[in-house]
Amino acid sequence: MELGQQLGWDAYFYSIFARTMDMQEFTAVALRALRELRFDFFRYGMCSVTPFMRPRTYMYGNYPEDWVQRYQAANYAVIDPTVKHSKVSSSPILASNELFRGCPDLWSEANDSNLRHGLAQPSFNTQGRVGVLSLARKDNPISLQEFEALKVVTKAFAAAVHEKISELESDVRVFNTDVEFSGRECDVLRWTADGKTSEEIGVIMGVCTDTVNYHHRNIQRKIGASNRVQASRYAVAMGYI
């Protein structure tokens, strides 16, 4: 970790991850770095932006597999206070009884899995996608002094982890905004989001209703929506319009 202090934490983490070629190798390198900080576990989790009620959760790291399966099966991402925090803040947050007061079962099960002391660091990519880096240890509570000292480290680590996982994994629904809409499709989306019907959009854009509906079908196919209302809501949530 002395090298991290010399190079700067961003450069240090990017450099050690640059040599990793797959998730297994990446996880091993990440763990070696984190164990120097006395952490036993790490998880980088992301929630898909859609669907809204049951977003898909993606987790990477070495959290106990039974816990990961339980977390996903119980849809804990919806109530997890660290996930909620990550949507409104870029600052790290300490896990505590107080933080998890509203979801005691989640906190109890995490403790039962040896995830007793930890913190969460939000991370944002250039497309606005939100990820959460969670670090945990079995023993030794994190003091406020240690937490303050870790802030610059965890922020750099989370950014480097996000970029490397994005490189190694190809699930564009989570990490990228590879869907491309034409200018006309964007216009149709915006007018639909404003409550206009196909007929009204056709008049505004100077095209026939069938042409507007053709654009709607293409939009729904690209974004994975079942109807035009859902498509416009997804487009807003994902930052396309």
From Swiss-Prot:
PROSITE patterns: HTH_LUXR_1 (PS00622), HTH_LUXR_2 (PS50043). GO terms for biological process: antibiotic biosynthetic process; quorum sensing; regulation of DNA-templated transcription. It holds the Pfam family GerE. GO terms for molecular function: DNA binding. Keywords: Activator, Antibiotic biosynthesis, DNA-binding, Quorum sensing, Transcription, Transcription regulation. The keyword Transcription regulation applies. SUPFAM superfamilies: C-terminal effector domain of the bipartite response regulators, Pheromone-binding domain of LuxR-like quorum-sensing transcription factors. Residues 198-217 bind DNA. InterPro entries: Sig_transdc_resp-reg_C-effctor, TF_LuxR_autoind-bd_dom, TF_LuxR_autoind-bd_dom_sf, Tscrpt_reg_LuxR_C, WH-like_DNA-bd_sf. Residues 174-239 form the HTH luxR-type domain. Transmembrane segments: none annotated. The keyword Transcription applies. Positive regulator of phenazine antibiotic production. May activate the phenazine biosynthetic genes by binding to a DNA sequence upstream of them, or to an intermediate gene which, in turn, interacts with them. Belongs to the autoinducer-regulated transcriptional regulatory protein family. PANTHER family: DNA-BINDING TRANSCRIPTIONAL ACTIVATOR DEVR_DOSR. This is Transcriptional activator protein PhzR. The gene is phzR.
